Amino acid sequence: MASEEASLRALESLMTEFFHDCTTNERKREIEELLNNFAQQIGAWRFCLYFLSSTRNDYVMMYSLTVFENLINKMWLGVPSQDKMEIRSCLPKLLLAHHKTLPYFIRNKLCKVIVDIGRQDWPMFYHDFFTNILQLIQSPVTTPLGLIMLKTTSEELACPREDLSVARKEELRKLLLDQVQTVLGLLTGILETVWDKHSVTAATPPPSPTSGESGDLLSNLLQSPSSAKLLNQPIPILDVESEYICSLALECLAHLFSWIPLSASITPSLLTTIFHFARFGCDIRARKMASVNGSSQNCVSGQERGRLGVLAMSCINELMSKNCVPMEFEEYLLRMFQQTFYLLQKITKDNNAHTVKSRLEELDESYIEKFTDFLRLFVSVHLRRIESYSQFPVVEFLTLLFKYTFHQPTHEGYFSCLDIWTLFLDYLTSKIKSRLGDKEAVLNRYEDALVLLLTEVLNRIQFRYNQAQLEELDDETLDDDQQTEWQRYLRQSLEVVAKVMELLPTHAFSTLFPVLQDNLEVYLGLQQFIVTSGSGHRLNITAENDCRRLHCSLRDLSSLLQAVGRLAEYFIGDVFAARFNDALTVVERLVKVTLYGSQIKLYNIETAVPSVLKPDLIDVHAQSLAALQAYSHWLAQYCSEVHRQNTQQFVTLISTTMDAITPLISTKVQDKLLLSACHLLVSLATTVRPVFLISIPAVQKVFNRITDASALRLVDKAQVLVCRALSNILLLPWPNLPENEQQWPVRSINHASLISALSRDYRNLKPSAVAPQRKMPLDDTKLIIHQTLSVLEDIVENISGESTKSRQICYQSLQESVQVSLALFPAFIHQSDVTDEMLSFFLTLFRGLRVQMGVPFTEQIIQTFLNMFTREQLAESILHEGSTGCRVVEKFLKILQVVVQEPGQVFKPFLPSIIALCMEQVYPIIAERPSPDVKAELFELLFRTLHHNWRYFFKSTVLASVQRGIAEEQMENEPQFSAIMQAFGQSFLQPDIHLFKQNLFYLETLNTKQKLYHKKIFRTAMLFQFVNVLLQVLVHKSHDLLQEEIGIAIYNMASVDFDGFFAAFLPEFLTSCDGVDANQKSVLGRNFKMDRDLPSFTQNVHRLVNDLRYYRLCNDSLPPGTVKL
């Protein structure tokens, strides 16, 4: 015993040293090695058993339990049965003897170790494992311990990790399911006993549900439940011990409910009991009582009581989240809704002492979250089922949800409730679409609730009604979606407004427009307060209170303009004529407001509080332009309705809008406002396309400004947008006009002069024999290239989907610039930033204008690129120029993707050199690099080469098909095909999951479209190599997220030759598997059933993978020299 005693002292001092602040990392590593070596010794567990019973040192106990955990989970198979019996007997005794004195984390770890033994040995070798747990629960002294054991068992056995065979996992689940009824009965008993013991009056269980009751239940869903008397009893004051037992019991239930099916085992009395405890979260009176009685030592604090409510709601939500509800359980579900709604009524009840909001503020935040989760689950999972019953009091439910939503104490809580309304509105919209006949009846049922919702959501986004809360919102920090808290708040609110608008357009419009009108009056009335001062114009509103009110009004106007813009889609299409007058009213107001802002230059005005009011004024102006832009599709429809008579009304709308835009296209205007004006101009040119646009003086003015070499250039983004608009005015066909009225000749001349002006400096860069390139600083040259190509690329990109005539004119104008680009390209091949921009330009040309460029010139471009991108140049770009260099190569490969997809024979002569470039030059450079750069583009190019040029590799003749039924095509260019397939195979051995997913999809597509897996060369030389690689990937768990896709791909490959798979491949695969013995291999083979349907086959694949890993784990854990029989 002395050696054990000595070892314990040594271990204690090592542990103390390890966790001491002064211990070096070097020494810590030495101690770690020492401890690991000790744990690996056979029989180390005996020392650990002694340590556990003899030490009070937490570190030593934790280490000893880790040794046991390792022994049981990794080495149990090799432990002699006598030792196993001893461990199974000693550890529970140790737990029983010390559970009251052990720190909770040590006790929980010891429970987990005992459950791990049960996971391996119950019921065969550890038959009393579960009986012991039940006995612990039933004995009052050990109830808490039994509940901890039960929860751990549910966690570890119902959803075990992968270190068990599939058969054992299934056996454990079945064993546990057999115990469910007993366990639920015990838990119900515990909760009821505690409740009854502490209740003022004795509770009687509710009547069991009888069939035929559901109609009454439905109509009374928001009335007091039959158990209301019970739910109205004062909540008992629990002592600490009882609260602890109840919280453990509820935690057990929540975990059990996460995996057991809904069935009669979940009795009405259990549900009612859970609801009793759910009241702990929402009964403020009881919390106050608890705090009054809190002076007595043994009473539970209000916070602890709140936690019981949270746990009970977790149980309810676990049941709610199950989509599949058996018929016999539906009644219970209705009872649950009834009882929860009863609690919701309690929470949202107004009385003198409490407003709803103050009551919600007093509740535990987690409890509110759980309640919101319940409502979300009710609407998303069960409303469809419940709402179809005519007895369901849907309006009362919405009233409750309304009160609950608009009294939320936090922004997050409010957002979550808006989500629920969004789900409800989506449900309603889809219901109406599927039952158009009942549309009126459905809408009438909900109309009042929806109008109320709309009004309240609109009030919530206005400072006029909600200033205190709105000012708390952060409008500076961007979240993951690149929006601020305020923007998110506004966006979510406007989504609800839009969804109501879709259902009730007239109501929504008549609610929103007057509110907008009020705020517009304030804005339009500012003109009278503008005075001229020495330095310009000043807004003569200085009183602090007036400034604050103006700030609020401007913020509200900005939000309401966004709301009006969001609703634009509900005025077009089939309803254009019916809602024309409303839309016209809106558009006229918007045109008036934008012109007003531009004319009196509110964006440049001096104000009393410049840091607040100036951004407000700029924002309103920008939002008015953006709202008008949202109506561009309506204007386009208006344009096509009036195109013959060009009614004055329409002409005025467009020309006034241009008068509002033109003054803003200036370097003196703030970017936010400038960009809003540019976007509106683009929409007029692209979406509306009125014939007379080009002749409006304001548009002429913009043309002159942009083509004037001496004018200051706008910021990049604005310059690109304005040039796009001007180009589109000249290039896009006018709607509803025949070809002979399109005035192409004059538009073509104008477009050529526009492009000529925009590319003047760029074309001058071209060296010529007469005037060799004049030296210009490199940075200046780069700037000209960047500025010109960004504009030209955008113009081409925006014309690429248009008519042939538009593209022809575009290319004629661009032709010289394109030739200059090709001439300049070799000079900049070592400047990767310039090459990147040039290749972007060429890629856009290839995608949009390759027909217009013509074959000879296109061939010249491709040949130039192929010559420039030598092996050395590619290596320099990929290996030494970082991300820009890689981007250059990726763009080049993208251009080649366009080339190989081109139908017809024109570019076929390039195929050999493109494949050679890929396989002999690019692939060797990137194959072994861990970085994913360039790989995705290269494999996409290889895939497109195969997909669009299948006959380059497989020549199929009609005669062959007729003669042999299924054509065994003639194979050509076999070495290239094999090399490409090998590259795909290699990519599956690399860690990059995105590349793996992409390439697996490519192979599957080639099989679906071209029967890749059936081709003789693939079938005979590659098929089972691919299956082998994919199986190994599953076994190594390196790409676990793609389990399902890999399983399907293995099935598709195996199904080409099932006989070969079962008879040859599978035995061969198992023979080659290391780490498993012959007997285990034969079990694995036997368990793989010869099913040929997809679900069974993939299930067999996953079973094989799981069990192979399990056997390896077991075998690794056996002591050296173990003889297995």
UniProtKB/Swiss-Prot annotation:
A GO-annotated cellular component: cytosol
Molecular function, one GO term: nuclear export signal receptor activity
Residue positions where Phosphoserine is found in the record: 199, 208, 224
Subcellular location field: Nucleus; Cytoplasm
Domain of life (superkingdom): Eukaryota
Residues where Phosphothreonine is found: 201, 204
One GO process term, biological-process aspect: protein export from nucleus
Protein function: Mediates the nuclear export of actin and profilin-actin complexes in somatic cells.
Protein name, per record: Exportin-6
